[in-house]
Amino acid sequence: MKVRASVKKLCRNCKVVKREGVVRVICTDPKHKQRQG
């Protein structure tokens, strides 16, 4: 899980999701998991 000010899709499997007011990126590749913070 990477915590970043600006979350971006890193590949075509990445999806930007908003959960409880937190922007997250979910992906089939665990290295691509990100959250905004």
Swiss-Prot record:
- Span of the secretion signal? none
Report a single Gene Ontology molecular function: structural constituent of ribosome
Question: Which terms are listed as keywords in the entry?
Answer: Ribonucleoprotein, Ribosomal protein
| GO CC annotations, alphabetized | cytoplasm; ribonucleoprotein complex; ribosome
Disulphide bridges: none
Q: Would you say which domain of life the source belongs to?
A: Bacteria
Which GO biological process entries does UniProt record here? translation
Q: Which InterPro entries match?
A: Ribosomal_bL36, Ribosomal_bL36_sp
Q: Which SUPFAM superfamilies match?
A: Ribosomal protein L36
PANTHER family this protein is in? 50S RIBOSOMAL PROTEIN L36, CHLOROPLASTIC (PTHR42888), LARGE RIBOSOMAL SUBUNIT PROTEIN BL36C (PTHR42888:SF1)
Family, per entry: Belongs to the bacterial ribosomal protein bL36 family.
Tell me what this protein is called.
Answer: Large ribosomal subunit protein bL36A
Gene name, Swiss-Prot/TrEMBL = rpmJ1
